[in-house]
Amino acid sequence: MSDFTSKVKVLRDGQKPEFPSNANTLEYAQSLDAQDELRHFRNEFIIPTRASLKKKALDGIIPGTQANGTTTSTDADTPCIYFVGNSLGAQPKAVRHYLEAQLETWASIGVNGHFSSLSNSPLTPWQDMAADCAAKSAAIVGAADPSEVVIMNTLTVNLHFMMASFYRPTDKRHKIILEWRPFPSDWYAFQSQIEWHGLDPEKSIVEMQPDENLYLSTEKILATIDEHAEDAALLLLPGIQYYTGQLFDIPRITKYAQERGIVVGWDLAHCAGNVELQLHDWNVDFAVWCTYKYLNGGPGSMAGAFVHERHGKVDMSLGKPVFKPRLSGWYGADKSVRFNMDKEFQPTPGAQGFQVSNPSAIDLTSLAAALSVFNKTSMKDLRSKALVLTAYTEHLLDEIVRRQPEGEEPAFKIITPRDPLQRGTQLSLLLRDGLMDKVAAALEENGVVCDKRKPNVIRVAPVPMYCRFEDVWKFMEIFEAAIRG
């Protein structure tokens, strides 16, 4: 059993792996890269170079194959350290090919592209593109069938559409249980949905607070569910908390809330393409996610939603369709009647019956290209690599802390859970007061791209699709110099 494989096994058991005394060397990092069976996927992506990050105008130069190999001596060829896939994934090389095919199709056959495709194109006819992307996303989120997935809109729009169907407050049950720090757009959606129903957010929102380490335990969540078992209508949590990187126990929390009559939805913005999901088997009522982070669909790319099959049924036994209430539109109509222009809405069975408008074929093209890369591997294999990559990152960060002078306040602490099964790829570093600007400037100057959350948090995400153990080692050299300088 290789060093890499043994670490995967240990981490999947929820344990911390042992690293050798030479772990903090380039040679050891490269040895892990050599054992990585997914390392070739890096060549599927365009990694910005140190030179390209400094661009001020278009010049027709796209960072290419040189930016994906080993480091060379010039900024023009040296790939940056791209640890920000939790904010925007790197561009798959397939995107340019797919977009060029789409533009040629539109130019060549015009409106016929809705129903026809060119024989050597990687794309389906436009009317089938959303369903095709849903089919390619089903395994990523653990749907039992592609019919449980719909690709449409963007995340917050989908959150509104799902809440229109699943948040049905009554005088008795009207509260929404949330975590302490939802992403602001989610928070705005929750507030506005409550107000839309004529309710007061102050009375209808239950906010769960974390402990002093910013950790929200499963026990605290279950206790809150019990406390509001009679008046909560909806539990809506992130699968991974965007600020701390904590991964919640989705199956346990879902089951517990549903047993008390509470509908359960999940915002999986930081889960989809990052951790293994089994939404159907976990009996999740609904979920939403974006595709521009770990799924690499491009800035603002089309988002996804999951609706469990039990909520997507269309009953025709009474001669007219009976289905779960929703905000309806023509593109949610069954394809067999979609172009009949009838007044009676007959939805497509499943999640795709929640569509409203004709989706952008251009946006779907970018996502289709990104998903074509995902479909060459599995979430199990990606998660296995991510576990080791993040554990190695954690180990080297701990070594930096151990090297600090005795008695000196640590320059940072990791606020992401140390349990590998309670986090994804991201590690959030809470910097000592006064360090953020200096560290951020040093990282930028040395070609490191990661996410900064003021006042003091840096989110580091070495995603497994295109990041290397060598990148982690190089990041540590730059980061330690920055906090010491």
Curated annotation (Swiss-Prot):
Pathway the protein takes part in: Amino-acid degradation; L-kynurenine degradation; L-alanine and anthranilate from L-kynurenine: step 1/1; Cofactor biosynthesis; NAD(+) biosynthesis; quinolinate from L-kynurenine: step 2/3
Keywords: Cytoplasm, Hydrolase, Pyridine nucleotide biosynthesis, Pyridoxal phosphate
Entry's EC annotation: 3.7.1.3
Domain of life: Eukaryota
InterPro entries from the UniProt entry: Kynureninase, PyrdxlP-dep_Trfase, PyrdxlP-dep_Trfase_major, PyrdxlP-dep_Trfase_small
One function term, GO molecular function aspect: pyridoxal phosphate binding
Reactions catalysed: L-kynurenine + H2O = anthranilate + L-alanine + H(+); 3-hydroxy-L-kynurenine + H2O = 3-hydroxyanthranilate + L-alanine + H(+)
Keyword Hydrolase: yes
Cofactor requirement: pyridoxal 5'-phosphate
GO biological process terms held by the UniProt record: 'de novo' NAD biosynthetic process from L-tryptophan; anthranilate metabolic process; L-kynurenine catabolic process; L-tryptophan catabolic process to kynurenine; quinolinate biosynthetic process
Binding site for pyridoxal 5'-phosphate: L155, T156, F183, P184, S185, D186, D267, H270, Y292, W330, N358
GO annotations of cellular component type: cytoplasm
Claim: Cytoplasm is one of the keywords in the record: yes
Main location: cytoplasm
NCBIfam families, alphabetized: kynureninase
Functional description taken from the UniProt entry: Catalyzes the cleavage of L-kynurenine (L-Kyn) and L-3-hydroxykynurenine (L-3OHKyn) into anthranilic acid (AA) and 3-hydroxyanthranilic acid (3-OHAA), respectively.
Subunit structure, as described in the record: Homodimer.
Database matches in HAMAP family: Kynureninase
Family stated for the protein in its record: Belongs to the kynureninase family.
PANTHER family: KYNURENINASE (PTHR14084), KYNURENINASE 2 (PTHR14084:SF2)
Protein name listed in UniProt: Kynureninase 1
Gene that this sequence comes from: kyn-1
